[in-house]
């Protein structure tokens, strides 16, 4: 038998990349050789290459829901990306392709279909993103995180697996996390995560509320690339990062409370780590509303407190954080009783079942 090979894809934001990494150790254990296809300048490249995974670059256009002159040129980039992906896949001859979505995945999935290579996609949110909606007809199966998602995946292709969570997240050290942030551990640690690309409204609101929050909490703020406020860099008890990767398990372990966007990967990691959290989902003005649905599901199950972006003010933020701390045991109890499991094993089973065998 030839060595098993899998090509992975997904990008545009960390949420379309890091879940792939959760699968890597188990895939290697099963004997898979792993390669990745992404864009030259995408966030996926820096994340994947740090893991010493072979990276292949293609062209791809962004999928926009708004009017932009690039909407006329980007389809040609996608077409170029399809031809580039076909060339790569014919050369690499993988047994299967795994897609985590994002605009870079579209040409890869279409190319795999043309090359008659099985494709397994994963959808994190309740409703499929635009890239996955385009890709579903070319997929063999689509792994879903939420039970509600199955109704939104056409062709009876959906399989409920849960979301893959990186094993290293469970191996963080609180002491190391405090050291990384320069905190003493005397105050509760409040962690703010605005997504890998950052959130201006969350960043601005947190900083406007700093004078009140910092009296009660040590604050670690992951604010997105280019969003560090140098004027606040020496403020005691307030540590800023544009993005963290290897340090994340330690910093998350040190966190007592978390403010986060409501992307599915992020919230399921918070659930797995049993972190009391305040979710601020992207508004419908700047998204398809998927984060609002995710947040509503978690709020309904008692895992999260939710504030809508349109309602967010510094005063309300402070009130909600204080309330979250006072009710933290209630949220931990709900999370501890959750039936949701790490999706790694389930997804690996799907990949192994549908891989193309070669003699």
Curated annotation (Swiss-Prot):
List UniProt keywords, sorted A-Z. Cell cycle, Cell division, Cell membrane, Cell shape, Cell wall biogenesis/degradation, Glycosyltransferase, Membrane, Peptidoglycan synthesis, Transferase
**Signal peptide feature range:** none
Metabolic or biological pathway, per its Swiss-Prot or TrEMBL entry: Cell wall biogenesis; peptidoglycan biosynthesis
| Localisation per UniProt entry | Cell membrane
**GO molecular function, one example?**
UDP-N-acetyl-D-glucosamine:N-acetylmuramoyl-L-alanyl-D-glutamyl-meso-2,6-diaminopimelyl-D-alanyl-D-alanine-diphosphoundecaprenol 4-beta-N-acetylglucosaminlytransferase activity
The entry's UDP-N-acetyl-alpha-D-glucosamine-binding residues are 13-15, 166, 196, 291
Listed GO CC annotations: plasma membrane
Reactions accelerated catalytically: di-trans,octa-cis-undecaprenyl diphospho-N-acetyl-alpha-D-muramoyl-L-alanyl-D-glutamyl-meso-2,6-diaminopimeloyl-D-alanyl-D-alanine + UDP-N-acetyl-alpha-D-glucosamine = di-trans,octa-cis-undecaprenyl diphospho-[N-acetyl-alpha-D-glucosaminyl-(1->4)]-N-acetyl-alpha-D-muramoyl-L-alanyl-D-glutamyl-meso-2,6-diaminopimeloyl-D-alanyl-D-alanine + UDP + H(+)
Report the record's Gene Ontology biological process terms: carbohydrate metabolic process; cell division; cell wall organization; lipid glycosylation; peptidoglycan biosynthetic process; regulation of cell shape
What EC number(s) has UniProt assigned to this enzyme? 2.4.1.227
* A Pfam family reported for this protein in Swiss-Prot or TrEMBL: Glyco_transf_28
Q: What is the recorded membrane topology of this protein?
A: Peripheral membrane protein
Read off the NCBIfam families from this record.
murG (TIGR01133), PRK12446.1 (NF009102)
- Similarity annotation: Belongs to the glycosyltransferase 28 family. MurG subfamily.
Give the protein's function: Cell wall formation. Catalyzes the transfer of a GlcNAc subunit on undecaprenyl-pyrophosphoryl-MurNAc-pentapeptide (lipid intermediate I) to form undecaprenyl-pyrophosphoryl-MurNAc-(pentapeptide)GlcNAc (lipid intermediate II).
According to UniProt, the name of this protein is: UDP-N-acetylglucosamine--N-acetylmuramyl-(pentapeptide) pyrophosphoryl-undecaprenol N-acetylglucosamine transferase
Say which species the protein is native to: Clostridium acetobutylicum (strain ATCC 824 / DSM 792 / JCM 1419 / IAM 19013 / LMG 5710 / NBRC 13948 / NRRL B-527 / VKM B-1787 / 2291 / W)
């Amino acid at each position: 038998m030839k060595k098993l090979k899998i090509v992975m894809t997904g990008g545009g934001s960390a949420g379309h990349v890091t879940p792939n990494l959760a699968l890597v150790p188990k895939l290697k254990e099963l004997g898979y050789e792993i390669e990745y296809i992404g864009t030259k300048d995408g966030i996926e490249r820096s994340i994947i290459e740090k893991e010493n995974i072979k990276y292949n670059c293609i062209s791809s256009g962004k999928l926009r829901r708004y009017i932009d002159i690039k909407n006329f040129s980007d389809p040609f980039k996608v077409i170029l990306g399809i031809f580039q992906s076909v060339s790569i896949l014919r050369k690499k001859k993988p047994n299967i392709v795994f897609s985590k979505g994002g605009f870079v995945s579209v040409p890869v999935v279409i190319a795999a279909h043309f090359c008659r290579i099985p494709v397994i996609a994963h959808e994190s949110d309740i409703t499929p993103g635009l890239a996955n909606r385009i890709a579903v007809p070319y997929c063999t199966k689509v792994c879903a995180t939420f039970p509600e998602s199955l109704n939104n995946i056409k062709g009876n292709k959906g399989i409920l697996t849960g979301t893959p969570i990186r094993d290293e997240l469970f191996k963080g050290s609180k002491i190391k996390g405090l050291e990384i942030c320069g905190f003493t551990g005397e105050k509760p640690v409040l962690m703010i995560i605005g997504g890998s690309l950052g959130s201006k409204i969350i960043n601005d609101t947190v900083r406007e509320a700093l004078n009140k929050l910092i009296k009660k909490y040590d604050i670690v703020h992951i604010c997105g690339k280019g969003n560090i406020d140098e004027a606040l860099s020496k403020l005691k008890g307030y540590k800023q990062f544009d993005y963290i990767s290897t340090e994340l398990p330690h910093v998350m372990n040190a966190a007592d409370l978390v403010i986060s966007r409501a992307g599915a990967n992020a919230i399921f990691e918070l659930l797995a780590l049993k972190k009391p959290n305040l979710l601020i989902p992207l508004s419908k003005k700047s998204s398809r509303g998927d984060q609002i649905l995710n947040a509503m599901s978690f709020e309904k199950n008692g895992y999260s407190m939710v504030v809508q972006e349109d309602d967010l003010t510094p005063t309300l933020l402070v009130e909600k954080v204080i309330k979250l701390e006072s009710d933290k045991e209630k949220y931990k109890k709900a999370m501890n009783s959750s039936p949701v499991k790490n999706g790694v094993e389930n997804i690996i089973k799907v990949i192994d079942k549908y891989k193309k065998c070669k003699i």
